[in-house]
Amino acid sequence: MNRTDRLRLWYERAASRWEETLPIGNGSLGAMIWGGAPCEVLGLNEESLWSGWQRDRNNPGARAHLEEVRRLIREERYGEAEAVAEAHMLGEYGESYLPLGSLHLAFKHGPATDYMRELDLEQATARVAYTADGATYEREYLASFPARAILVRLTCSQPRMALTLSFESPLSCRTRADEVGLIIEGQCPEHVDPPYIPDRPEAVIQGERGRRFSARVRVLSGDGTVRARDGRLSVDGASRLVLAVSAVREPELPAGASYETLREAHIRDYRALFDRVELWLGPQKAMPTDRRLAVLREGGEDPGLYALYFQYGRYLLIASSRPGGLPANL
């Protein structure tokens, strides 16, 4: 097998829960790809979308109890030291990381056959392919650090691809549509309780001090007819469509740049990091990744899966943290 065959996660069905989705990211903007047919969902996150606003949440009275806690520790009275610290030295809870929302692609075709989805770790691309109504549909997704955007290429072997694009979010936002794409503008709540504390009446406070944000879904190229209506885009009679998703930061999309050019720049940038390490623990098994995991749980041997798991961890770190952005938050 060549290296590309070794470094991919692939499946013969769409994700049915979040843990099965395919993640892509450029350090600041990420997507979890469900791979549904005919209804695709991209769960979107942006690194700076938190509840709250900039303020000092340290406990000003903590210093007064510091010496007492140190004394109790020196006396090996650790339980008492912990109780004093928890009662008098802790600050307020931190705020909550929030999802940007979901991009929905609803295709108008019949049941899918010959289904496959994959995450290529060598090129940092995700792909979904299947057949429906006698035509072959393919989708490719990548999160480009140079372009500061998520790129989506949709193709159909016949010029009859029809779909509706829409955006949904749990945040307070408004979506507008024109023939160029979708425009999303919103505001994060000024407070959201962390999920690990008990529910209380004011667990979520929208207020006016939360972070404001914007996002765009642009139609970069394609054929067919694109119409905007009621905050959605409708596409009919297409064989090819390229989208760019951006949030908070303006994307770097040179005028006239083709998808292929943007894709090559993405792969070149990503591989400068990913290609620093190789690991070979044996040949790969020619079966979907979820079946390989099931065999391993039943006591089977699959050394190649451990190597894939190692490289998947490296892929996730590259996807979630890049220069100029925030550290990975998980």
Where are these predicted regions, by residue range?
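Aromatic-residue-lined binding/catalytic grooves and analogous aromatic/hydrophobic interfacial grooves
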Residues: M1-L330
